[in-house]
Amino acid sequence: MKFIFMYFIFIILISSILLLLNKFISIYKKKDYEKSSPFECGFNPITKANLPFSLPFFLMTMMFLIFDVEIILFLPIIFYLKSSSTMISYLMISIFLILLITTLILEWMNNYLNWLF
């Protein structure tokens, strides 16, 4: 336990030294307006907006991310089932699958899976 604590202190100390060293060695540079402005074929942009944002693409990405996390949570359960085959583990897996399928059906019924709303 003492070794782990000393190792933790050592890592924090090295990180702090590197951060302070970076702060003192780096040179403060003035920002030049011409160098920091975007080059767009010789004219200044009217707005400072970023690239266009597609809301359906974002919603589809969020649904994919949530579904992917659910699958990642499901994988260890499969390995657990291999080692213990009790009724509780089967019940746990079936409840998880029912929730997963129910959310998929709800997304489908509410037309969240369509690309254009």
UniProtKB/Swiss-Prot annotation:
| Keyword Protein biosynthesis included in the entry's annotation | no
Q: Which Gene3D superfamilies match?
A: NADH:ubiquinone/plastoquinone oxidoreductase, chain 3
Question: Where does it mainly reside?
Answer: mitochondrion
Which reaction is this enzyme known to catalyze?
a ubiquinone + NADH + 5 H(+)(in) = a ubiquinol + NAD(+) + 4 H(+)(out)
Q: Which Pfam families match?
A: Oxidored_q4
Tell me where it resides. Answer: Mitochondrion membrane
**Keyword Transmembrane in annotation:** yes
State the membrane topology: Multi-pass membrane protein
Any one Gene Ontology molecular-function term assigned to this protein's record: NADH dehydrogenase (ubiquinone) activity
Enzyme class at the top of the EC tree: translocase
- InterPro entries under this entry? NADH_UbQ/plastoQ_OxRdtase_su3 (IPR000440), NDAH_ubi_oxred_su3_sf (IPR038430)
Give the EC number. Answer: 7.1.1.2
Q: Which PANTHER family match?
A: NADH-UBIQUINONE OXIDOREDUCTASE CHAIN 3
Q: What is this protein called?
A: NADH-ubiquinone oxidoreductase chain 3
Q: Which organism is the protein's source?
A: Apis mellifera ligustica (Common honeybee)
Mind giving the lineage of the organism this protein is from? Eukaryota, Metazoa, Ecdysozoa, Arthropoda, Hexapoda
